[in-house]
């Protein structure tokens, strides 16, 4: 059974979780850079970083605390500068270019 805290993205305490697919140093470094860049935008609220346990467990943990968007950084990210955004409520996933990430998340959270 999936436990989900369905808060509006506007009021969710943590808006975004940055989740590298593994603890690979390249992925960790890139993930932390993406987190820092999003934080520096200043309008996206609290952005959590988590690289513990399996990606499935991390998704479930974020669902339980109401995080509306998880951004997954994987080995494709290194090659094509794209990340996966996972939507909490629908569990839909979409690939998006890193350069469009901040604008996309801002639009999703506040519109």
Where are the predicted features?
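NTP/phosphate- and nucleic-acid-binding module
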Residues: 1-111
